[in-house]
From Swiss-Prot:
GO biological process: arachidonate secretion; lipid catabolic process; phospholipid metabolic process
Superkingdom in the source lineage: Eukaryota
Protein name per the record: Phospholipase A2 homolog P-elapitoxin-Aa1a beta chain
Role noted for this protein: Heterotrimer: Snake venom phospholipase A2 (PLA2) that has presynaptic neurotoxicity. Inhibits nerve-evoked twitch contractions but not responses to cholinergic agonists acetylcholine and carbachol and to depolarizing agonist KCl. Causes a fade in tetanic contractions. Displays a triphasic mode of action with depression, enhancement and blockade of neurotransmission. Does not display myotoxic activity such as changes in baseline muscle tension or inhibition of directly stimulated muscle twitches. All subunits are necessary for maximum toxicity.
Native source species: Acanthophis antarcticus (Common death adder)
Annotated GO MF terms: calcium ion binding; phospholipase A2 activity; toxin activity
Length: 31
């Protein structure tokens, strides 16, 4: 949903990978 999508983009912005990679693999921040 949009909430999870927004969290993935936020995570991607804090990481080293582009946001598209996070949309493909999911966000693993904090794990």
């Amino acid at each position: 949903d949009l909430f999870q999508f927004g969290k993935m983009i936020e995570c991607a912005n804090k990481g080293s990978r582009p946001s598209l990679d996070y949309m493909n693999y999911g966000c693993y921040c904090g794990k």
